[in-house]
Amino acid sequence: MDLDSLVMMKNSTLTSFSLLALMALPTQAYAQSSSQSEEAFIHSLYAEALDVQQGYQWLDDLSTNVGPRLSGSPGDSMAVLWAVETLDSLGFDRVFTQAVDVRHWQRGEETADFESASGSKVLHVTALGGSVPTPGGNGGEGITAEVIEIVGRDDLHAKGHLLKGKIAFFNEPMDPGLIRTGSAYGRAGWQRWGGASMAAKYGAVAVVVRSLTHRQDDFPHTGAMAYEEKVAKIPAAGISTNDANWLSSELKTAKNGHFHLVLGCKEKKRKTSYNVIAEWTGSSHSDEVVVVGGHLDSWDLGRGTQDDGAGVAHAMHALWLLKQSGYTPHRTHRIVLFANEEFGLDGARAYANEGLEAGRKHVIALESDGGSGAPRGFSVHDVPGAIEAIKPFDKQLARYGCRDWAIGGSGADVGQIDDDGVLLIGYRGDSQRYFDYHHTAQDNMDSVHPRELEMGSASIAALLYLLDKNLVSR
């Protein structure tokens, strides 16, 4: 959807806009000042990013030399050290950390097979993040039970009476008809997040959940799940799409089939991790703070490259592009690399509550947490007038691929920042392949095209530049 359509759709709400009261934009003056020199500066950001590919180098270093960064793990600690050392080398005014209490869950053995009169098959599974183990944990007897397939919430309630003592197999696929893959992910995600407790209420002994991806392959996807209070905690595993399709077909004909599942995961004592913050002090409005961020933690199956190493690289490189260009910011700009997004947004909540000193205020917060895909645009939090605040920059960025402007979905981390009038923005890269790698062993550098990543960094840098340069302060 283009910005003109969005503004027309939101016209009825644009009269009372706290953000524009904070940062009124003189649109006529901006139109007159949209000079060749400004366009040339933006072009230089893209040229520098594509030529040097510094963000790609940082991402490769983080992915290859640090690797998976599950909260509380040794990789998480290594990532904090990596971020501090790397940001320290870039000459920002200060680099510091903020301690965050984080969850520490550890993966263990994970095996599964299905046996029936027609034979047996080993299946590709992985524990969902936060799952309890099967009986005996690593090396234990696991769980063996019949399987009931569930396709949708209505099907769950219709078949609930069949689930006692059985394994619930949640097999609702992501909707392939939705253009925005994140929307398809969101609609199908209830199975992973809440399926275990929903099935446990009917007496199920475990759940197996179809991986959240459009791709048909043998790679199971992990991701966070949660248990409801006062409901039995039962083991939860993700199963690859190929095996989910096979199991669904097999259940239609197999007689007396049994699923055997072993998960050795366990909950450990909480640990301390850190948000890592680099600050570039503003020249004229240093009390107004602009945040650009991604989350430093990742899941443990792959290298955390797409989720969210790419966002880390975007945040670091976007601000570095502006700094090395010689630009002097009006407002204080911060890179914030958030701790533990995957397991509860602990870092974002800590930063929102205690990350900013008295007398200062967030005015813009931008997040990248959708992978390294080529730029498509930005989403803006649904606050009256937010689209109007960035509409004048549409033509400046469209030539670089940023044509998709959406309301809502700025990002889970920056969404915790609720300063009055703050403009919350999410970077939108091409997402059609993102969920091929998301939360899997395939999330590594092989999934990244350096030019796509660098175009994203430059697009974020360009938008930050336009906002800082043209939005009038309080």
What does each model-identified segment do?
Residues 38-41, 60, 64-179:
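Noncatalytic luminal/extracellular "stalk/propeptide" segments of secretory-pathway proteins
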Residues 39-73, 219-224, 297, 364, ...:
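N-terminal capping segment at the start of a domain
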Residues 40-41, 116-119, 124-160, 225-305, ...:
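Soluble metallo-hydrolase cores and metallopeptidase-like ectodomains found primarily
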Residues 42-50, 64-74, 145-149, 180-196, ...:
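Second-shell loop/turn segments in exported
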Residues 16-26:
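Bacterial N-terminal signal peptides
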Residues 194, 272-275, 298-390:
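Acidic/histidine-rich catalytic neighborhood of metal-dependent amide-processing enzymes
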Residues 152-162, 166-214:
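A conserved hydrophobic secondary-structure block that centers on an alpha-helix together
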Residues 200, 206, 210-211, 229, ...:
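Active-site-adjacent substrate-binding region
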